[in-house]
Amino acid sequence: MGKIRKLDDQLSNLIAAGEVVERPASVVKELVENSIDANSTSIEIHLEEAGLSKIRIIDNGDGIAEEDCIVAFERHATSKIKDENDLFRIRTLGFRGEALPSIASVSELELITSTGDAPGTHLIIKGGDIIKQEKTASRKGTDITVQNLFFNTPARLKYMKTIHTELGNITDIVYRIAMSHPEVSLKLFHNEKKLLHTSGNGDVRQVLASIYSIQVAKKLVPIEAESLDFTITGYVTLPEVTRASRNYMSTIVNGRYVRNFVLMKAIQQGYHTLLPVGRYPIGFLSIEMDPMLVDVNVHPAKLEVRFSKEQELLKLIEETLQAAFKKIQLIPDAGVTTKKKEKDESVQEQFQFEHAKPKEPSMPDIVLPTGMDEKQEEPLPVKQPAQLWQPPKQEWQPPQSLVREEQSWQPSTRPIMEEPIREEKSWDSNEEDFELEELEEEVQEIKEIEMNGNDLPPLYPIGQMHGTYIFAQNDKGLYMIDQHAAQERINYEYFRDKVGRVAQEVQELLVPYRIDLSLTEFLRVEEQLEELKKVGLFLEQFGHQSFIVRSHPTWFPKGQETEIIDEMMEQVVKLKKVDIKKLREEAAIMMSCKASIKANQYLTNDQIFALLEELRTTTNPYTCPHGRPILVHHSTYELEKMFKRVM
């Protein structure tokens, strides 16, 4: 007798369920997407014990006809495609016909549905077996309940996480569906507590406010772009609003939430040096395209996609974000703590200021540079890589013994308070309508960010604090500037231009510098010698596993040539293939940091003024190359509020 046998349908469904139904969040995703495909405008999601005990989805969609109810629970039965051509023109969220039979095979499922023009159908299925089927009175739409998930697959149940973790997975997927379809009203309940309610009015910004808070919604930048193949809309936060993971970025393709690393990378590239290292924005991008340009049939979960014009799409995203940030004011405001206003107060007043809590004032160590005391120690000037700026009548190099190491940068005032996702919020059902109306009113009060351009206004120096922070003013209020970050931005744009030049002016080293590598590293570098010349690394083979450097570009910071060569080589050997664009970027960032003034260096008034004027000429005077803020703004009103001059 042969060893190969055909599996029965029940076992096949159990195997298929392993890919489609990984956890309760998978069930919620598939059932809610079915409701959206059925043209629902209102969907309720009820959970017990994070969906492990019970998941109930109620919608007002088209419903299922009686004759289709049994067929819907057979494998690969669907109403969404008819032939192979439809597979390349998919506009619906579901199409594989695997979700319902997979869910029914690992749970106890009850279905009540009606198309509205005939009696409804009541269906009970346990572990894939039909227990009961009958006609019933029902309104138009579908009410489906999934209980005792994984009751017949204890191995899968054993690997479920805690209630809190599983609930977090569900809320995450519901949030992203809500962003994808703001035209659908979604209600999410857990153990009879309402966690989310969206109005379904089509305003995605209101949905974002419901999920991430009003304060985050105030910091959103609208994104719009269109090409022959793609239409992009959405919102991303200002660079001052960041999170520690990419989980707060959502990408939607033709109404479908997808996980795509290259799309997230394109969003990050759009920010370029505006983001601190290891920080990520909150973002929502909706991309519309011809279904022929995207393959959604990659995995049964339908979260992965492939694009046929990926590079064009990535370039459009990057350029759109970069253009948007060039049009807006990026100086973060340092807010004032105010008591929470009562609901009957003006909503507009709630939106005027951030609620960042100021630190208690202490006695400042501020140097007033206008009247320098002759007895005090002569201040150290800024180092001058490539003569970026020169204070008048001062030509001398600072004694290195007096230059302290740069301290770890800590902003004296945080630009914005961290706003975690609110995973659970209890809503009183009696206040439901009032809460939604209030949210709608608040979102309406969020004004579009002023498009004032990227110009930094003139700043007039007041003094210097701890040899690290510069205080300046203008008619807009008080500005605090990190002097190291400011010159780092100036130097970065200078070096970025130099590293990118084809013809390099070189200077000979007095003694050739030798670099010893492992054989693997040597072979990797040897392949890229011509490319490395483009970033100022002129290497000659010296022996079997060594190179020597005889010259370097003249714009290398003086006294740090060999250190820069070592760090650039370290970047090269870490990469399997040299990315010249990335290497140029890293080289410019590294040299700008090394060539800039450090903390605890006191400057003259002329030096401070020259630094601020040079900063104004940069293309991005708001963040250093590492993404840290250069300056923080206190408006005159905020200062008056702080000192109780206004109430």
From Swiss-Prot:
Signal peptide bounds? none
Pfam families per UniProt: DNA_mis_repair, HATPase_c_3, MutL_C
Q: Which GO terms describe its cellular component?
A: mismatch repair complex
InterPro entries, sorted = DNA_mismatch_repair_CS (IPR014762), DNA_mismatch_repair_MutL (IPR020667), DNA_mismatch_S5_2-like (IPR013507), HATPase_C_sf (IPR036890), MutL/Mlh/PMS (IPR002099), MutL/Mlh/Pms-like (IPR038973), MutL_C (IPR014790), MutL_C_dimsub (IPR042120)
Q: Which GO terms describe its biological process?
A: mismatch repair
A single GO molecular function term of this UniProt record: ATP hydrolysis activity
Q: Does the keyword Kinase apply?
A: no
| Record's keyword terms, sorted | DNA damage, DNA repair
Q: What does this protein do?
A: This protein is involved in the repair of mismatches in DNA. It is required for dam-dependent methyl-directed DNA mismatch repair. May act as a 'molecular matchmaker', a protein that promotes the formation of a stable complex between two or more DNA-binding proteins in an ATP-dependent manner without itself being part of a final effector complex.
HAMAP family the UniProt entry points to: DNA_mis_repair (MF_00149)
Family per UniProt? Belongs to the DNA mismatch repair MutL/HexB family.
Q: What is this protein called?
A: DNA mismatch repair protein MutL
- Organism of this sequence: Bacillus cereus (strain G9842)
